[in-house]
Amino acid sequence: MIISKTPLRMSFFGGGTDFADYYKNSRYGYGTVISTALDMYVYIMVCKRFDDKIRVCYTVNEFVDSVDQIKHNIIREALKMLGIEKGIDIVYSADIPLSSAGIGLASSSALAV
């Protein structure tokens, strides 16, 4: 079982200036980002199942037979990248409501950790 706790982040300045496309093509050079970690967290719990099913729990519960059936884009693509095809439980929660539209506190970045 793996459990992670990652702080959410608030950016004050420089949102996309740290992307290579910006600093390689900008006349200003490298980007500058000012942000801070918050005292609110994203929690992830991952454990092996004893069958071949995949269960993903966040604001909805997904119980599927294959990785391709997972609706949560980040989790689906992370499992594909890692070569995990079956037999896993993933629970994703946070101290704030999570939304697929984004909340501006880097919850998807925290999930990637």
Where do the PLM segments sit?
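ATP-binding N-lobe of GHMP and related small-molecule kinases
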Residues: 1-109
